[in-house]
Amino acid sequence: CIIHGPHEKHLTNYINGFRCQKCTPKSSVEYEILNLIPSSTINNRTFISPLEIDILSEKFKFGIEYNGLIWHSYGKSSYEVLNNLSKLDKNKHSNKTNMVEEKGFHLFQIREDQWLNPIKKEIWKSIILNKINQSKRIFARKTYVVDLSNFPKLIETFLNENHLEGFTDYDICYGLIYKNRIYSIICLSKNDSEWELKRFCNFRGYLVVGGISKLFTTFEIIHKPTSVITYANRNWSSKNIYGILGFNYIEYIEPEPEWFNPKNNNFIRVPNDINIKNNDLYNNGFRVFFGCGKNKFKKVYK
């Protein structure tokens, strides 16, 4: 493989067109995900024709895209199909999500490195199982709220193990406790007079019915905000939950470039003002990936 070097491959796989397993592990992963979802189809080419959806569940009204990093990114390469900077389109994934949402469905876009990470893989499984009503349920009325703000290590561990974006800075954090275990967490920070809802997540495999409403209402009663904003990652989030809390949609935020080394799929931090189409990162083998952007919501109190 031009990207990953020499590797062994069974003759049958070669005949069937399967190349380097680091570049094209997609098929086996798709079937792994497919097995989680009853009555779903793979490689649907009719729902948003001519584009394809990797996995589609018409019963539960959602689809899943598995985005291999090599084939869904842009960069320079001696391999012609990967030498694709001239075709750079930062809205490619976002546009597909738009097409699915126009049909009244929700689209999850799973990034390859997330599925290959054992913890994030379990988070994704939890998200999918929740979508098909297979999560274990706890009713918020059976829980009680605790202020966790002074327990940063506990919060960090919970977020890293249960939220795809992991830990973030915060000013306050509340949790829901049931039988001496934390099942939900909400984190907010304050900038001048405006608050931001930065994280909410449940314990993997569980859905706390009414949990986010109970936590957010607690915050409102104690802190009496004048306004709260939040940003929803369109790779997995839907608009519905924010409407329940009284938020209004404000705007769509375009996806930011995410840079990674294709030899190990490690992402790096890069200054925001870097030239996307012309920089030394490409010459050093790095590639750029674009997600689906974010939706901004705001709640204003009168």
Language-model segments: residues:
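C-terminal "cap" of GNAT-fold acetyltransferases
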Residues: F260-Y282, R287-K302
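Conserved active-site alpha-helix within GNAT-family acetyltransferase domains
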Residues: N235-Y252
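Structured loops at beta-to-helix junctions and adjacent beta-edge loops in soluble globular domains
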Residues: L148, S189, F200, V300-K302
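Nucleic-acid endo/exonuclease domains
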Residues: I2-I172, C201, Y206-K239, W259-F267
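Conserved catalytic-core motifs of GNAT/GCN5-like acyltransferases
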Residues: N248-P262
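Conserved beta-strand in the GNAT
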Residues: G175, N180-E196
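Active-site beta-strand termini and strand-to-loop segments that position acidic
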Residues: I55-F60, L176-K179, K299-Y301
